[in-house]
Amino acid sequence: MKIILRKDVATLGDAGEVVTVKNGYANNYLIPQGFAIRATEGTLKALETEKKQQAHKIEQRRKEARELSAKIEQMTLNISTKAGESGKLFGTVTSGDIADALKAQGVEIDRRKIQLEAPIKALGKYEAVAKIYMDIAAKLNIVVGAEGAEAVETAEAPEAGE
């Protein structure tokens, strides 16, 4: 009997595949358990249209992911945090902090998709990778600065002009 798998079955194949199995196996186990449906002309046509729709959705998501990747790679994330005089941070800059900085600039990415090469524990420039969709990733440029540094620089600027 020809059947269409609805779920992955280790011994038969992946979901969406058309396979031939013995009648008893299909009627007594696969179909009642929801692992498969009978392969009729109607179900085969429905499977083809579903595959086309899935391919279209995947292509649409890939296009959106490429656009988002290009947008992210043009950004520079400025993260301010508490740091000591030697430039060492009190704590670390995590992927959650980077995700929050991206969200502040209008881009929402899950923190688990941001990969750091090493923990950020000092002031400076860093790079990270954000996995956006499947094989599409974006390089993040991150500048970590001290929280009080901007206030000190702006306070010194008027004095120099006088």
UniProtKB/Swiss-Prot annotation:
GO biological process, one term: translation
Molecular function via GO: rRNA binding; structural constituent of ribosome
UniProt keyword Cytoplasm present: no
Assigned protein family: Belongs to the bacterial ribosomal protein bL9 family.
InterPro entries: Ribosomal_bL9, Ribosomal_bL9/RNase_H1_N, Ribosomal_bL9_bac/chp, Ribosomal_bL9_C, Ribosomal_bL9_C_sf, Ribosomal_bL9_N, Ribosomal_bL9_N_sf
Record key words, sorted: Ribonucleoprotein, Ribosomal protein, RNA-binding, rRNA-binding
One GO location term (cellular component): ribosome
Known role: Binds to the 23S rRNA.
SUPFAM superfamilies: L9 N-domain-like (SSF55658), Ribosomal protein L9 C-domain (SSF55653)
Gene from which this protein is expressed: rplI
Keyword Ribonucleoprotein: yes
NCBIfam families associated with the record: L9
Protein name as annotated: Large ribosomal subunit protein bL9
